[in-house]
């Protein structure tokens, strides 16, 4: 028979272990506590203002790209569509936003032709160039090139990170472009288990 102190120690360890395990269990990059990546309002592909604050209670996933992107944007959106499928019914509590870095060409009409092809629940966002630049700065997203200028290159170089906000609206995770869908689903499920703030 175990002594009382041993039982108490085992009980304390059992209580602490889940908290420690969950804290260290993210497979993406944990950026919890950063002072950037705040709320913003842009225009959706349906022509309506959309604020990220409206998605409190959901896990919010953001990707910055553009519809004429020749490489990572399409595959990344396809990967995020696969993520929603893998989440099954839990996908109802996940919202994915595609924020253009090419507002000159990516009008609401252009986004409407592009974004819902990957998943009808995705929302494409655009705005004035200065609005997009401000949001990109706040999320540490770099992009170069201006296709509206004839001398500019036909493509825009941009960051490929995927940003994940928790149900309370705080930026919590970064996924690299090559992060497997299974790892994304694992982390999103952890965030979905957290209490609403």
Question: Which positions does each model-derived feature cover?
Answer:
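Short active-site neighborhood of thiol/selenol oxidoreductases, capturing the structured segment around
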Residues: 53-80
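C-terminal motif of bacterial Sec signal peptides marking the signal peptidase cleavage site
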Residues: 16-19
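Thiol/disulfide oxidoreductase modules built on the thioredoxin-like
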Residues: 131-187
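Structural microenvironment flanking redox-active thiols in thiol-disulfide oxidoreductases
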Residues: 75-135
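Hydrophobic beta-strand anchors of alpha/beta hydrolase catalytic cores
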Residues: 61-62, 96, 162
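A short beta-strand-turn-helix
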Residues: 40-60, 84-87
């Amino acid at each position: 028979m175990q002594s009382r102190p041993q039982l108490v120690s085992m009980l304390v360890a059992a209580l602490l272990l889940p908290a420690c395990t969950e804290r260290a269990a993210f497979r993406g990059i944990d950026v919890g506590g950063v002072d950037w990546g705040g709320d913003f309002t842009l225009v959706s592909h349906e022509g309506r203002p959309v604020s990220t604050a409206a998605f409190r209670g959901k896990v919010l996933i953001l990707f910055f790209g553009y519809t004429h992107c020749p490489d990572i944007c399409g595959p990344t959106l396809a990967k995020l569509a696969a993520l929603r499928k893998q989440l099954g019914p839990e996908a109802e509590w996940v919202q994915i936003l595609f924020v253009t870095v090419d507002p000159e060409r990516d009008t609401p009409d252009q986004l409407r032709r592009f974004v819902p092809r990957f998943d009808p629940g995705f929302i494409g966002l655009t705005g004035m160039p200065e609005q997009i630049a401000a949001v990109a700065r706040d999320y540490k997203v770099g992009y170069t090139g201006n296709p509206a200028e004839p001398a500019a290159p036909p493509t825009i170089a941009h960051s490929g990170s995927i940003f994940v906000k928790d149900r309370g609206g705080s930026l919590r995770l970064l996924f690299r472009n090559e992060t497997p869908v299974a790892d994304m689903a694992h982390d999103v499920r952890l965030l979905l288990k957290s209490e609403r703030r």
